[in-house]
């Protein structure tokens, strides 16, 4: 099926029109519930006919969508409708009749002979076709949004002044060459200029026209539309750039060949000459009220009634066919179609003449204003189930459309009820949008310590790299709102310094981890809507303000909003290949860890019967925060992946979307970094489609055209095509289906080249068996249950589908729209912090000073201005340091004693009457403040003079003139006194330094006095004095020191250890120490783990010290109640059977026998359970031991499994005999396994 991405053609294809007429006739009397079946059956029957009249369902869908836009084209270029929404479907073009061809050629010659047409079309060879939607580079900006997702009409596609509006600067920006970027050219003779002029004027006279002179160099033929994606840079903020940013429009002209500049300039001059009278008439700036055009005025909302609409049944059938195409997923993006229908619902009739274009006879009714509104209302009524799946914010915006009342009252009430229910419902899994206190990545000892680096140099270098990274981030946060901020020039050198420190692979790995973790922290910023904050704002005015403020040139958030722009620019200016490679790996690892993790999984079928759960695994979802993190990771992973292949032209503009065969052949030889098809297929089989699909779509949307044609991407897209073609609302979870349809539809918008592949996939009838099987398994997991948890999906929907924000903007009611281009709101920026603070302080002080003092202040300022920079810096430094030191001195000598005295007086209050206590407290603290202020006035100036004198003595040379020294001291004293007085006022007098809520404090004092009185009346039996534990005969710290001394000597110098009696005495102290109650948990943990290590060292270093008494005493310590109750992590016995300990015992069978004796005693005494012991043995089976060691381990396990069966100690802990028997049985199995491992 030959196709081309165009909105519509001048002449619609005739076979499809005949089938539309036949279809309308056949479906007229079919019941509503059989429409879909008859509709599909009709095309199956037609598809078996002859080739001339053959029409597949896909061809018909392509034709119908294009014809629908063509029929309503008259409403695109005036203010009565929203921005035109062109179809993204490929138009199946058949050869028109001969008469039509002649007519088309005449019209083409007429258009091409007009200079105006050539100027407005910007070298576009198809002046009668509507511009194709442009391709953006990000998820937040829907492709083609310049032609769709905008709440104002786009009149730039109408073609010059003939489109119904006046001359503007935009008519010349595309064609007029930019002289600042031109190279010096050789002088062109007048003859050549004349030849070039004739060649440019006669370029469209026909295919047989030949140029009069040969160009100096060969120029490849190229047609560039001003709506193609070549004029938006890679990773730019939005797809609105071409329509809203004059600078980018002007840059797009640079890709024209320089040999055409003279011709373009001549055309511009001709255009000005032709429009001389019109320009003169538009010269006055002040336009009178009579001269205003209807489009410049704001009209009130007109009332409309759908009664008496002509051909109502015919229009209803058309809306039914349109609805069936949407239900069968024969439209690339269902949200795009909904936006188009809402626009049709809001159109108004200004009585303008209809656009002269071919309209199929079956759709002629849509050229009428009221018929168009009726058609849209019926379509929305048919798509009620789809509207109910929108999130609460989108539903609220949709219900703001006044013409939605044209729908049946029951439908509108159901939408309002559903919206209210969603707003009232709350779920514990909602995304936490509160501002987090964590702004930076915390230091983790296990990941960032010195042990994780090969040398001290790399460790020190990474600490410097970390500091430089955060300095760059802080600098960006302060300066990026400045209009003149330039990331490469201001932060590029700082980022270069990061890589200069070290590019060791370990450092790059840690830097990549830091980058990704900080990205996830910074991206989770508070983004509450006014509704969530409880603000009652005008939604229309708020939407307009958001359109102008959120980004520089877009009405919605850009591709990298807020702090994500810093990380994007950081990657863009990165000159380290090592960092980019490690960053790509880290992004993928984090993404896969979140995608495959089972920790955050939530199953939607928790309340379904057990037998139903066993039949299916899903569907599973993740928490909202996890989904948001995966989308961010996928976006940046795609950005880093495609960045080497997003080449730019010589002028800095991105290359047009051209599929280079050489590039495709070259990149086919290299295997991709990871298999997308395998990841998607595994998720579909495991019921994790709703987890993987959103981030996978985000990743695919970031890829370039060549990457999308690689084998792995093609296989992944075929799987998505199969899912999109087969997924339906019926018998499936509606919210899950909506998320899947919206994500895949958005991908087709983000990558318009994929639309042809989708329709070609639907048209084929063989070779998709494996895909169908996978899709059937996935859809089975999405089957609908009565008890499914819809609220979870409601919270996940706006995060998994962030493009709903653009959809909301597109359907927001707009009664006033002028040009379709948004103006900038220049952010009011502060000056440098020092200047702003000094100016504000000067203004405050100047307003309070007398004229004489103001004059004195001016003299001081003039004096400081006359001094050099070092002197001014000296005065500022001494002022700051003396101010802080005097504050500390005053706190120690004045404020703290004053507060202690006031607290002592409060403790002396004995009354229990609340009013009396409150009055006493007020008097006490009031006197304390007055006394503190009095002492502050008396002593602070002395403290200040003393500090100033000491500071100047240390900083100034001894030969400094006394007058100059006193001048410096006076300047410092004046500034410091002002700061001290401000600190006293804000931090003491107007703060809670002395007390908090005085009423609450009075209540506490009354309650305390009342309790004391009650206790005294009871005879003093309720004393709460601290009771110390009895003396145990030794110092605990001395005991711990002795234990550490034994461990140290046994490890290094066993010959220096004490005697066996000293060891027995140590264990007796341990038995007494663990019986002390209410000691810190770490104290018991040190004793228990220390004894474990002590017995290990005795086995390997001093086996003659180990006897039954030592083992029994150790078991009694481990069985103490304090150690049994402690839940320290790691546990006491975690290192009992370690790999290093077994390696040390490998050459000694006696060591294994002594270990067996210890473990048997521990099992019999109940110090350890058999199941816990099994867990300690399990890591040993991951090692490759020698047959001798395996034999000794097997014998050890066999003896332990037999020794503990008759023990009754495990009953004391509450364990059942069955569990203990199973543990011993498992130990026997481990013994057999260890004995037979050497045979494998």
Swiss-Prot record:
Superkingdom of origin: Eukaryota
Residue ranges of the region described as Disordered: 105-162, 179-218
Ranges of compositional bias, category Polar residues: 128-155
Effect annotated for changing residue 1209 to D: In strain: 2b
Keyword check for Nuclease: no
Record note on what altering residue 1167 to T does: In strain: Oregon-R
Biased composition (Low complexity): 113-127
Keyword terms of this UniProt record: Cytoplasm, Phosphoprotein
Modified residues (Phosphoserine): 156, 166, 1234
GO biological process: chromatin organization; imaginal disc morphogenesis; morphogenesis of a polarized epithelium; olfactory behavior; regulation of cell population proliferation
Known role: Regulator of cell proliferation and cell survival of differentiated cells independent of cell division. Essential for imaginal disks formation. Not involved in cell polarity.
Leftover remarks: Its transcript shares the first untranslated exon with the alpha-Spec transcript, suggesting a common regulation. It was initially identified as a candidate for quantitative trait locus (QTL) that affects olfaction. However, given that the mutant used to identify this gene also affects the alpha-Spec gene, this result is unclear.
Record-given protein name: Protein disks lost
Provenance organism: Drosophila melanogaster (Fruit fly)
């Amino acid at each position: 099926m030959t196709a081309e991405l165009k909105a519509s053609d001048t002449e619609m294809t005739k076979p499809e029109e005949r089938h539309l007429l036949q279809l309308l006739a056949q479906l007229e009397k079919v019941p509503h519930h059989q429409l879909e079946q008859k509709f599909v059956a009709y095309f199956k029957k037609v598809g078996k006919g002859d080739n001339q009249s053959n029409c597949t369902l896909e061809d018909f869908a392509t034709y119908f969508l294009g014809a629908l836009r063509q029929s309503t084209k008259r409403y695109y270029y005036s203010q009565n409708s929203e921005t035109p929404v062109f179809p993204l479907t490929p138009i199946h073009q058949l050869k028109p009749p001969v008469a039509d061809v002649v007519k088309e050629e005449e019209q083409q010659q007429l258009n091409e002979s007009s200079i105006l047409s050539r100027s407005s079309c910007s070298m576009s060879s198809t002046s009668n076709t509507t511009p194709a939607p442009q391709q953006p580079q990000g998820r937040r900006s829907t492709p083609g949004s310049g032609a769709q997702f905008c709440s104002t009409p786009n009149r730039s596609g109408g073609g010059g002044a003939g489109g119904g509006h006046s001359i503007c600067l935009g008519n010349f920006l595309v064609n007029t060459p930019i002289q600042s970027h031109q190279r010096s050219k050789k002088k062109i003779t007048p003859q050549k200029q004349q030849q070039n002029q004739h060649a440019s004027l006669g370029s469209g006279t026909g295919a047989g026209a030949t140029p009069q002179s040969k160009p100096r160099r060969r120029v490849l033929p190229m047609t560039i539309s001003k709506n193609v994606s070549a004029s938006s840079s890679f990773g730019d903020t939005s797809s609105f750039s071409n329509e809203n940013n004059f600078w980018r429009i002007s840059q797009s002209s640079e890709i024209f060949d320089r040999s055409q500049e003279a011709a373009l300039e001549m055309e511009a001059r001709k255009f000005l000459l032709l429009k001389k009278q019109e320009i003169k008439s538009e010269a006055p700036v002040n336009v009178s009220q009579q001269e205003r055009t209807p489009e410049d005025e704001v009209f009130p909302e007109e009332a409309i009634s759908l009664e008496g609409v002509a051909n109502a049944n015919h229009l209803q059938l058309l809306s039914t066919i349109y609805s069936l195409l949407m239900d069968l997923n024969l439209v690339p993006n269902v949200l795009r179609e909904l936006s188009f229908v809402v626009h049709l619902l809001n159109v108004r009739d200004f009585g303008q003449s209809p656009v002269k274009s071919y309209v199929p006879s079956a759709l002629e009714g849509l050229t009428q204003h009221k018929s168009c509104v009726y058609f849209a209302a019926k379509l929305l009524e048919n798509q009620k189930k789809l509207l109910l799946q929108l999130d609460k914010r989108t539903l609220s915006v949709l219900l703001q459309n006044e013409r939605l009342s044209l729908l049946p009252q029951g439908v509108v009430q159901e939408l309002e009820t559903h919206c209210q229910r969603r707003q009232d419902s709350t779920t514990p899994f909602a995304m936490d949008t509160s501002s987090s206190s964590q702004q930076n990545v915390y230091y983790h000892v296990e990941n960032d310590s010195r042990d994780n680096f090969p040398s001290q140099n790399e460790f020190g270098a990474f600490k410097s790299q970390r500091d430089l990274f955060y300095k760059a981030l802080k600098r960006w946060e302060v300066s990026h709102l400045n209009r003149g901020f330039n990331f490469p020039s201001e932060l590029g050198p700082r980022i270069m310094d990061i890589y200069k420190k070290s590019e060791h692979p370990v450092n790059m790995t840690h830097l990549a981890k830091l980058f990704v973790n900080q990205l996830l922290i910074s991206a989770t910023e508070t983004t509450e809507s006014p509704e969530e904050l409880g603000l009652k704002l005008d939604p229309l005015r708020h939407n307009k303000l958001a359109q102008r403020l959120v980004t520089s040139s877009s009405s919605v958030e850009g591709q990298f909003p807020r702090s994500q722009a810093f990380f994007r620019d950081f990657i863009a200016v990165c000159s380290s290949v090592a960092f980019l490679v490690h960053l790509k790996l880290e992004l993928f690892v984090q993404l896969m860890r979140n995608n495959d993790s089972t920790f955050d999984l939530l199953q939607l079928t928790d309340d379904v019967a057990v037998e139903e759960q066993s039949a299916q695994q899903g569907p599973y979802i993740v928490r909202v925060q996890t989904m948001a993190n995966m989308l961010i990771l996928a976006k940046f992973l795609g950005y880093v992946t495609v960045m080497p292949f997003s080449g730019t032209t010589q002028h800095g503009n991105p290359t047009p979307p051209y599929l280079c065969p050489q590039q495709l052949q070259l990149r086919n030889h290299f295997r991709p970094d990871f298999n997308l098809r395998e990841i998607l297929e595994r998720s579909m089989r495991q019921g994790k489609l709703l987890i993987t699909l959103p981030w996978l779509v985000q990743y695919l949307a970031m890829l370039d055209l060549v990457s999308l044609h690689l084998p792995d991407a093609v296989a992944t897209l075929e799987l998505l095509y199969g899912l999109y073609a087969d997924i339906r609302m019926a018998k499936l979870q509606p919210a899950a289906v909506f998320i899947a349809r919206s994500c895949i539809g958005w991908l087709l918008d983000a990558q318009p080249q994929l639309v042809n592949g989708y329709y070609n996939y639907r048209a084929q009838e063989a070779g998709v068996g494996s895909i169908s099987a996978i899709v059937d398994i996935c859809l089975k997991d999405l089957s609908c249950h009565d008890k499914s948890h819809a609220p979870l999906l409601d919270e996940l929907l706006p995060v998994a589908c962030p493009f709903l924000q653009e959809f909301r903007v597109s359907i927001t009611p707009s009664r006033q729209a002028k040009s379709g281009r948004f103006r900038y709101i220049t952010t009011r920026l502060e000056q440098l912090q020092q200047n702003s603070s000094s100016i504000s302080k000067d203004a405050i002080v100047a307003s309070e000073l007398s004229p004489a003092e103001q004059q004195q202040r001016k003299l001081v300022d003039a004096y400081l201005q006359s001094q050099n920079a070092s002197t001014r810096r000296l005065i500022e430094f001494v002022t700051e340091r003396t101010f802080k030191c005097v504050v500390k001195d005053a706190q120690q000598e004045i404020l703290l004693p004053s507060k202690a005295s006031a607290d002592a007086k409060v403790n002396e209050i004995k009354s229990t009457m609340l009013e009396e206590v409150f009055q006493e407290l007020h008097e006490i603290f009031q006197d304390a403040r007055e006394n503190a202020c009095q002492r502050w006035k008396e002593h602070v100036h002395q403290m200040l003079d003393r500090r100033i004198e000491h500071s100047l003595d240390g900083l100034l040379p001894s030969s400094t003139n006394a007058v100059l020294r006193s001048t410096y001291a006076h300047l410092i004293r004046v500034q410091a006194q002002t700061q001290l007085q401000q600190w006293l006022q804000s931090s003491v007098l107007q703060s809670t330094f002395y007390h908090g809520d005085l009423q609450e404090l009075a209540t506490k004092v009354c309650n305390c006095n009342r309790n004391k009185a009650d206790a005294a009346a009871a005879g003093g039996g309720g004393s709460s004095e601290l009771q110390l534990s009895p003396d145990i005969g030794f110092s605990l710290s001395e005991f711990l020191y002795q234990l550490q001394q034994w461990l140290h000597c046994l490890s290094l110098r066993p010959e220096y250890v004490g005697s066996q009696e000293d060891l027995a005495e140590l264990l007796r102290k341990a038995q007494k120490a663990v019986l002390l109650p209410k000691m810190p948990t770490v104290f018991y943990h040190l004793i228990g783990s220390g004894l474990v290590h002590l017995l290990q060292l005795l086995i390997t270093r001093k086996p003659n010290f180990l006897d039954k008494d030592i083992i029994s005493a150790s078991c009694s310590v481990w069985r103490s109640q304090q150690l049994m109750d402690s839940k320290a992590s790691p546990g006491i016995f975690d290192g009992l059977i370690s790999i290093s300990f077994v390696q040390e015992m490998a050459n000694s069978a006696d060591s294994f026998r002594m270990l067996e004796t210890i473990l048997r005693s521990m099992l019999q005494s109940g110090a350890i359970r058999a199941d816990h012991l099994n867990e300690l043995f399990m890591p040993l089976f991951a090692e490759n031991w020698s047959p001798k060691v395996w034999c000794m381990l097997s014998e050890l396990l066999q003896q332990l499994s037999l020794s503990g069966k008759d023990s009754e100690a495990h009953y004391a802990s509450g364990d059942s005999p069955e569990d203990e028997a199973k543990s011993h049985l498992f130990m026997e199995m481990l013994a057999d396994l260890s004995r037979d491992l050497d045979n494998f």
